Amino acid sequence: MKNPSYLCSIINLNLNKMNRKSIFRALAVVSVMLAASLSAQAQLYVSSQTGNNSNDGSKGAPLKNIQKAIDVASDNATIYVAEGNYYGTLNKGNINVTKPVKIMGGYKTDFSERDVLKYLTMVQPTPEANGTTEATGGTMTLKINTPNTEVVIDGLIFDRGNSISYNAKGDGKPAGVASPMMNPIGAAGIGGPELTTTNVLTKQTSMIYLNNSRCDITIRNCAFINGPNYAINGMFGGKKATITNNIFINIVMAACEISGGGMANETKEVHFTYNTVLFSWARTRDLGDMGYGYRYMTGNINHYVSNNIIGLSTFAGIDRTRSESDKTKDAARITTAENNIFFLNKQGDLTLPGGGMFMRVNVEDFADVDQLAKSGGNKSMADPKVFKGIINEPYLNGFLSASYKETATSDPNAPENKFRQAMGMNQTGTIQSSVSMYANRYPWKEALKFFGAMNGYGAQKIKN
């Protein structure tokens, strides 16, 4: 008979083998569970129609809101968004992107197919959201402080037309245009889809606001329609921002204005390519300042603008009036304009600093502009027939004839003026002002026709 201690060692060895196998099995199960969990965080699905924020965010159990998906996502996650309307949790009016993620819109409700212009993923706030939206930032605000990461916004349709205040008296409404003129910020008016909501107040925020994010940014295949205060605006602290294959229709101030942020010794780049920018309106209804398609801003940032269609601006298509305070830095700036089409910009295709008044430059003279490092291939198009059947003709006609006028009246025989005259004071009068059109609502579904309007220029057909 063998030594009992030997038998015990054999038993212990077998138990150890069993324990090892059990441990390995347990570790394998845990690894699979962890992988599944990480996968769920790295790929999230959102549907306003079938989702619930208590779901796990899988394709079969999507979340309801983009904001919720961002909140639970891991860094570098991809968020797939089905057709529907999304403007914040509880429809508050804001989406805050606080992590480097990719947001991909344009999916069918069951996520079996993607077609950005068929399965419309909207960011279209209501008038009610004006009361709850944050006062600063934008309808979507990018707040990412991690360098060497990227945010992608792809296939979203931003439209603020329903939440804007329009003139309740019907002033400034050319024949056939969808709405009266936009009210000044702070003036109550009508709004909503059918213009039946009263006491609407416009929120003066951008559509996408860059809150000095340190990540790289790509915005593509998106629509920006009826913006009361910029489409894309803010400070950029990453390395490269790419704004490509988008449409910007009926935007107040400017379609795109990005300044350099981040570290002062780091050079940033903006690439603005293959975009269609039409109907850029001035700051106010007197059609005075602003009203640009694209602005070359400062802050150690280079701008590359190419293959765009930029037209129908109340001031100019592109603006290069901003300069660095340090002349050496300003001389080192790179600003380009290549292979763009300009047409019917009211005061010029490009503005430059000059003698207390801005210089207005037409596209034919771009080669003489020292501030443009490259300026080849640009064209002027005087006749917008290429957009026949695409552009809203009543809106176009109203824009081309838009005008502002003031009428001053003063009655020297009025009692108050006789008194003021006797006292050696200036007499008073009244000024009546009127405008034929100002930032009226553009039909957002019609605006989507501009995708693919001209081969090689502006927004092209979307590759889903």
Model segments located where?
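Right-handed parallel beta-helix/beta-spiral solenoid domain characteristic of secreted/periplasmic
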Residues: 100-195
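Bacterial Sec-dependent N-terminal signal peptides
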Residues: 1-43
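N-terminal extracellular ligand-recognition/capping segment immediately after the signal peptide
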Residues: 67, 75-102, 106-113, 140
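Right-handed parallel beta-helix
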Residues: 105, 149-162, 179-196, 214-226, ...
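Extracellular beta-strand solenoids
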Residues: 81, 88, 97, 105, ...
